[in-house]
From Swiss-Prot:
Reaction equation(s) it catalyzes: guanosine(46) in tRNA + S-adenosyl-L-methionine = N(7)-methylguanosine(46) in tRNA + S-adenosyl-L-homocysteine
Pfam families associated with the record: Methyltransf_4
Keywords: Methyltransferase, S-adenosyl-L-methionine, Transferase, tRNA processing
EC number: 2.1.1.33
Catalytic residues identified in the record: 118
PROSITE patterns registered for this protein in UniProt: SAM_MT_TRMB
Protein name listed in UniProt: tRNA (guanine-N(7)-)-methyltransferase
Binding site for S-adenosyl-L-methionine: 44, 69, 96, 118
Classification lineage: Bacteria, Bacillati, Bacillota, Bacilli, Bacillales
CDD domains hit by this protein: AdoMet_MTases
Pathway(s): tRNA modification; N(7)-methylguanine-tRNA biosynthesis
Organism listed in the record: Bacillus cereus (strain G9842)
Top EC class for this record: transferase
Binding-site residues, substrate: 122, 154, 191-194
Entry similarity comment: Belongs to the class I-like SAM-binding methyltransferase superfamily. TrmB family.
Amino acid sequence: MRLRHKPYAMDRINEYSHIVIGNPEERAGNWKEVFGNEQPIHIEVGTGRGRFMYDMAKANPHINYIGIEKFTSVVVDALDKLIEEEVPNLKLINKDAEDLTVFFAKGEIDRVYLNFSDPWPKKRHTKRRLTYKTFLRNYEEVLVEGGEIHFKTDNQGLFEYSLMSMAEYGMLLTYLSLDLHNSDFEGNIMTEYEEKFSSKGHRIYRVEAKYRTEPMQ
């Protein structure tokens, strides 16, 4: 994805600091206070322009959502949507997900979404994949016991790698689809990329993986 510089982006983000939360590390352990309720919290790592989080939050007002996106010129598009129609159970973070364990306390998050992440196909970039073991460890750190990852992609190579990585980490694969849009899965909410790729005939892969509460035998 080619990113277009938007000189107004930081000013816009700073103006709406109640939506794009600045200094999220200062909120660790207190995110329910940010939302003002005790509802569960789901996060999306690499939220892009925010369509998925926006639609999820609208459809599920009983759940709080946080979209994490490191690119300022992208997250400002998600912000613009929320300026037009603010959704109280959705916040944004404009930071790198490598710092996830700094933003949230242990067990503060109930679910992690990974949608159409950069596949980083070259072997030397394996550690950058959002399903690499280091990231899986970070997700486990902030998730409740037995927390889940829901992962979608159109990239077969990344999907196969992710299944292997999750299995090697000891996670339970509780749902698997090799062709989501031709499956019996109900309630799928599409991302911008998902709509684009599926319209071109790309197959969409999906997995739900759960962290074990007891060590493998």
